[in-house]
Design a protein with these regions (language model features):
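Bacterial N-terminal signal peptides
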Residues: 4-14
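Mature, extracytoplasmic segments of signal peptide-bearing proteins
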Residues: 15-19
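GH16 jelly-roll
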Residues: 20-259
């Protein structure tokens, strides 16, 4: 069970160091440049009985072969967000939460601790996005979709991808697929260090991919955690539902000057 944590908004004055309770479990943060330190800027530990909608928006609309629905989003009362994939009549429902209009942020260290789905037919993701991704002409500097992870497979592979210059004929992308033994068992952390110069991706605190592809995005993005149904992940009609994707926490750290 995670310790409760008072959220400090990005626009608020920072709390004195002594007033900040410890996070449990603690994150393994990357080593910082000399004279710099990590500072927690935003987080959700998913304590309580229902989703904190001062932090999250819950979209509801058709997405690929299913519908994003509030019916698929809940908390388990044990400090975890539950994102369900289920059948509702003749429709399939799954889940998305996002910080659109609540947290739109550039740079820093983004980390989520999750337990992945058990069934085929749908894929889970932790990603950064904004409408600026649709801009064309300045490569990814004016907007990049950053997929910290996508998981369409039930094996050790993890998809990490960048998309820029919109989604039409000018669309460009670059990705990497590391193998992470045991990733389908228990909880794991997926994270990104996004600096003005490069992206560094991690799984369980270990670097998996370092890249500058597309020209590093300089625009604020918001967080999305989602589940989608489509052929990429297999045939949803052949699996046993409901299935669950659990999120233990999401945290964002800023790199600041040491005092």
């Amino acid at each position: 069970m995670k310790a409760a944590l008072l959220l400090t908004a990005l626009t608020a004055l920072p709390l004195p160091a002594a007033a900040e309770p410890a996070l449990t479990p603690a994150d393994t943060l990357p080593a910082t440049p000399e004279g710099k330190a990590w500072k927690l800027a935003w987080n959700d530990e998913f304590n309580g009985e229902k989703l904190d909608e001062t932090k999250w928006d819950v979209p509801e609309y058709k997405r690929r072969d299913s519908w994003w629905s509030r019916k698929a989003v809940s908390l388990d009362g044990k400090g975890r967000l539950v994102m369900s994939t289920l059948k509702d009549g003749d429709k399939f429902l799954d889940a998305c939460v996002r910080t659109r209009g609540k947290l739109e942020h550039a740079f820093g260290y983004y980390v989520a601790r999750v337990q992945l789905q058990k069934q085929a037919g749908h894929w889970t993701a932790f990603w950064l996005y904004n409408d600026c991704v649709g801009k064309v002409g300045n490569e990814g500097r004016d907007g990049t979709e950053i997929d910290i992870f996508e998981k369409p497979w039930l094996d050790d592979r993890v998809q990490q991808t960048l998309h820029w210059d919109g989604y039409g004929k000018e669309h460009k992308s670059k990705g990497f697929v590391p193998k992470v033994p045991g990733v389908m068992d228990g909880f794991h952390t997926f994270s990104l260090w996004w600096s003005p110069e490069e992206y560094v991706f991690y799984v369980d605190g270990k670097e998996t991919w370092r890249t500058k592809d597309g020209g590093v995005c300089q625009a604020p993005l918001y967080i999305k955690i989602s589940d989608e149904i489509g052929e990429w992940a297999g045939d949803i009609r052949k699996v046993k539902l409901p299935d669950e994707f659990l999120v233990d926490y999401v945290r964002v750290y800023d790199l600041i000057d040491k005092k």
